[in-house]
């Protein structure tokens, strides 16, 4: 293989590389075997056409595209490695020449990782809007949340108030015509929860079981169903039940209901304080780490960050989000219909975060390189064991899923983060 690289602009260039016949011939054989079973020729059973007959009838050139797809990935990666390039986006491949019996020549337009000029990243002084302190109010608030979770809904003989739950039937109409999704039976609605469009819940305050209430509202201009956006609607609503929350007393019995390992309310407060202090400590450390990394990135200069890196990071985030939606049974088409958004609308919110994430990774990688951080065999094994424990899977399975290079990279990145944060101080 012969390779060359022509620089076209900052972080951009063209690789030219060749693929030898000793690589091409096996690829042509695989391409032929792939289609052989479907071939017919006089005097031969289907799927048994000899290669010379095929070449004479169709020409070997018809196999070139499939053969190229077979041999290209390995050839391209070999060229990138030989040239010592750090490519960061999908290349644009073009065929320069593909002649029978000769080596093939291809070109690849590539984007390379930008230069990072590091600034100060050690002994940084940062400000954080966080505290390690846990107050009595924090402990009481946690207990109160648990107390509210144990509340029971009981039938209320009287008017519905904010915070009460009403069980309703409703039928919605616009200009006297009922509309899709405007009907519900035995729906439990907590007044003040904001589940329904603005104004709906407020008009049920004061209603009693057995009442029929005409609720008049206007759909927001931004409502996802365009045929309803901005329109006035009427909902004929029947109140079946009014329920109110009955919250348990704040006493030792409540404490035991919340946590069976404690005997008194005071025991629960002590336990919750320890838990909150541990969580607050972690939150504080995370805030310091985030602020220190952010300052290290701000102190660095990234020379002509390629927009392709941002686009690829956005695509990764969008694909991850849509994958989560599909696992919940929501297809991309359904999601866009339900939300009234487009593919472009989905990409936009991720752009700023993607830009920040790409810059952060580049700077941390540059610090790891500047410090000469590498992963030892024992560190790699420890990382594998830690991941196996975290994801509850055998270590061998983790080892098979992650390449050694990926693990080495992650460990070096962690060391770089450690050198930033361990030397940082809080103003």
Swiss-Prot record:
Gene3D superfamilies under this entry?
3.10.50.40, Trigger factor ribosome-binding domain, Trigger factor, C-terminal domain
Look up keyword Cytoplasm and say if it applies: yes
What GO biological process terms are annotated to this protein in UniProt?
A: 'de novo' cotranslational protein folding; cell division; chaperone-mediated protein folding; protein transport; protein unfolding
- Does Chaperone count among this protein's keywords? yes
Q: What class of enzyme is it?
A: isomerase
Query: Which of UniProt's keywords are assigned here?
Result: Cell cycle, Cell division, Chaperone, Cytoplasm, Isomerase, Rotamase
Q: Which Gene Ontology terms of cellular component type are present?
A: cytoplasm
Q: Which residues form the PPIase FKBP-type domain?
A: 163-248
UniProt-annotated location(s): Cytoplasm
Question: InterPro entries from the entry?
Answer: PPIase_dom_sf, PPIase_FKBP_dom, Trig_fac, Trigger_fac_C, Trigger_fac_C_sf, Trigger_fac_ribosome-bd_bac, Trigger_fac_ribosome-bd_sf, Trigger_fact/SurA_dom_sf
Report the catalytic activity: [protein]-peptidylproline (omega=180) = [protein]-peptidylproline (omega=0)
User: Which GO terms of the molecular function aspect are on file?
Assistant: peptidyl-prolyl cis-trans isomerase activity; protein folding chaperone; ribosome binding
Q: Which SUPFAM superfamilies match?
A: FKBP-like, Triger factor/SurA peptide-binding domain-like, Trigger factor ribosome-binding domain
Q: What is its EC number?
A: 5.2.1.8
Q: Name one Pfam family in it.
A: Trigger_C
User: What is the UniProt domain comment for this protein?
Assistant: Consists of 3 domains; the N-terminus binds the ribosome, the middle domain has PPIase activity, while the C-terminus has intrinsic chaperone activity on its own.
Q: Which family does it belong to?
A: Belongs to the FKBP-type PPIase family. Tig subfamily.
The UniProt function text for this chain reads: Involved in protein export. Acts as a chaperone by maintaining the newly synthesized protein in an open conformation. Functions as a peptidyl-prolyl cis-trans isomerase.
In terms of NCBIfam families, this protein maps to: tig (TIGR00115)
Protein name as it appears in the record: Trigger factor
Gene name on record?
A: tig
């Amino acid at each position: 293989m012969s390779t060359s690289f022509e620089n076209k602009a900052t972080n951009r260039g063209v690789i030219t590389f060749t693929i030898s016949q000793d690589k091409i011939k096996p690829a042509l054989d695989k391409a032929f075997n792939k289609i052989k079973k479907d071939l017919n020729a006089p005097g031969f059973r289907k799927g048994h056409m000899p290669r010379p007959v095929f070449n004479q009838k169709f020409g070997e050139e018809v196999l070139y595209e499939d053969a190229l797809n077979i041999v290209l990935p390995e050839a391209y990666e070999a060229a990138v490695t030989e040239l010592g390039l750090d490519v960061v986006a999908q290349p644009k491949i073009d065929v320069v020449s593909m002649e029978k019996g000769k080596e093939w020549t291809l070109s690849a337009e590539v984007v390379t990782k930008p230069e990072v000029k590091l600034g100060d990243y050690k002994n940084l002084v940062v400000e954080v809007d966080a505290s390690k302190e846990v107050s009595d109010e924090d402990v009481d608030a946690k207990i109160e949340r648990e107390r509210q979770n144990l509340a029971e809904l009981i039938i209320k003989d009287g008017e519905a108030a904010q915070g009460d739950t009403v069980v309703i039937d409703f039928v919605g109409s616009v200009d006297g015509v009922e509309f899709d999704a405007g009907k519900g039976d035995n729906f439990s609605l907590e007044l003040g929860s904001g589940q329904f469009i603005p104004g709906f819940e407020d008009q049920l305050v004061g209603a009693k079981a057995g009442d029929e209430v005409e609720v008049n509202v206007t759909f927001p201009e931004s409502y996802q169903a365009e045929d309803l956006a901005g329109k006035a609607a009427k909902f004929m609503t029947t109140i079946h039940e009014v329920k109110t929350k009955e919250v348990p007393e704040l006493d030792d019995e409540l404490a035991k209901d919340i946590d069976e390992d404690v005997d008194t309310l005071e025991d629960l407060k002590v336990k919750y304080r320890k838990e909150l202090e541990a969580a607050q400590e972690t939150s504080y450390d995370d805030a310091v780490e985030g602020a220190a990394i952010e300052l290290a990135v701000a102190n660095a200069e990234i020379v002509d960050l390629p927009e392709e890196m941002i686009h690829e990071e956005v695509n990764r985030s969008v694909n991850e989000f849509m994958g989560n939606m599909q696992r919940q049974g929501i297809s991309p088409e359904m999601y866009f219909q339900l939300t009234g958004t487009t593919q472009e609308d989905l990409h936009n919110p991720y752009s700023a975060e993607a830009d920040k994430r790409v810059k952060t990774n580049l700077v941390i990688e540059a610090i790891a390189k500047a410090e000469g951080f590498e992963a030892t065999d024992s560190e790699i094994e420890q990382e594998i064991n830690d991941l196996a424990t975290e994801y509850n899977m055998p270590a061998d399975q983790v080892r098979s899923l992650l390449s050694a290079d990926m693990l080495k990279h992650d460990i070096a990145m962690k060391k770089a983060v450690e050198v930033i944060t361990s030397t940082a101080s809080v103003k």
